[in-house]
């Protein structure tokens, strides 16, 4: 990714015309389903070298702190929104505006205020404005093969300036492991390791090393640019280990390649960037970003190639190249400070001694908390803890020792907890708490740490027998093979019936004050009013739909009549399909669909019927695609009569584009494949 690039005359960051993304039938998801949105790859059929995908940091060799551990306390904003002055997470001011854009993201890249988001322990809602990076990807991206730079990443949507784009996630490493990996690299290897350096206290710098080479996310595909459109900001949420969040430094248009300055700067070049050979003899890798201000070489951090005792962090005014992927070196020469050093700088007695000193100086708990966190880093002191000790001092007790307590332990062994849960996934958290003799909240907290979440069993249409599973497997595998040898998806005509309820409202929970009474909701009647619709469509679009009259049911004669009407419309819409290729009907095995009058009509019209296994609505495009979107459209709507329901359905079908129908048909391939992968069982 870093090693190869090509000069070009197109605007910096824009793909060439021949690199314009197409719409392949099957889209590879580089993110393996672990992001909010799939991340495609281009050109069709190509894929990056395999790596283990993770949307968040994972602990790597030599790391001081596990990035998945929760180390920050939460705010207590329950009835009021999180605001500076009242929310402990916003002690440095607001981070985002009403549009979820980073505030004060100046064109000079001078954004230096610490960013702390509300975390899992905060009592504010999930809709809090201070929760942005933790929500993951909000735009569609595509990994694509560049002309000579290897793989890159581009957006398929417009991204406003200041919006969060993605993280640079990977293994969090110790400095010795970073040096070991870098010294093992050859000239042809790409370097993905990034070092973030943050000023902490008294000239000390806190460093975070991240390597997505083997375990990472889409951030590993970002290429360097001397005029980048992204800016990297360390954002802390649950842990002292920052998330390396990339924000749009300007408005980014669709199909524009995403890039950032590997040195961590933004349009803030230093001198001596044109030095080709470094002091220790290593050749700089050339930069071909195509920017007007291109420095000709990729950024480089010589400190990572030196022994630990000789490695110093350079001043911003020193003539020394910066790291390939590091934050700007704008701090004085200073001692290397790791996260673990930061945590261990003060033990309990030392920090309690500071509490006592501040108390005797007459300072308040809030002021004491601010002073300590400003001096030793965020999260060192908690205001409620300081208040507890101040109350103790007020009583004349100035002992700094812990009082003996007979309560339950606040920690559990995660391996033991995992073994209990995996042995019986149906066990409750309270049963686990009783078995381990800990509080219920302790079990919940540790379950989150080991990545366990509670999920209900998923409803399935039927409890399949082995014969039915085998039939699903055989049909799906045969259709995959047939389509591979002779594509036929564009010949498929599919249909199904659905009841549309007059009342589509659902009872839902509400956030209310404790003494406030909930709203009333009428109990559903046993036989609600409804109307049945039959819809026929293909990849080219809608063909025909009709509604049953009240009291009317679908019979084989009625269904044969529907086929006749559909065929007449199909001849007007897709005459070539009817006369030359021949349509292929895909429907389920309902009794009217397989009755003799229906089979005679299909034989008369020359329709082929595609094999379909019983109890398989997950393999019918009308069920998994059209009706799914129709249900979302109807949610919350209420109709007074059949005409209102018919008008709503007509509004739904008229709002869909041709691509909507093609997408539903094209999903058949992936669904057949999932069925094969699950040996005929239902799949998620």
UniProtKB/Swiss-Prot annotation:
Stretch list, region Histone-lysine N-methyltransferase: 1-345
Keyword field: Chromatin regulator, Chromosome, DNA damage, DNA repair, DNA-binding, Endonuclease, Hydrolase, Magnesium, Metal-binding, Methylation, Methyltransferase, Multifunctional enzyme, Nuclease, Nucleus, Phosphoprotein, S-adenosyl-L-methionine, Transferase, Zinc
Record's protein name: Histone-lysine N-methyltransferase SETMAR
Domain writeup: The mariner transposase Hsmar1 region mediates DNA-binding. It has retained some of the nucleases activity but has lost its transposase activity because the active site contains an Asn in position 610 instead of an Asp residue.
PANTHER family: HISTONE-LYSINE N-METHYLTRANSFERASE SETMAR, MARINER MOS1 TRANSPOSASE-LIKE PROTEIN
Outcome (variant: residue 623 to D/E): Loss of function in DNA repair. Altered DNA-binding properties
Domain Post-SET residues, every copy: 283-299
Residues annotated as binding S-adenosyl-L-methionine: 149-151, 192, 220, 223-224
Intracellular or extracellular location(s): Nucleus; Chromosome
Organism (species): Homo sapiens (Human)
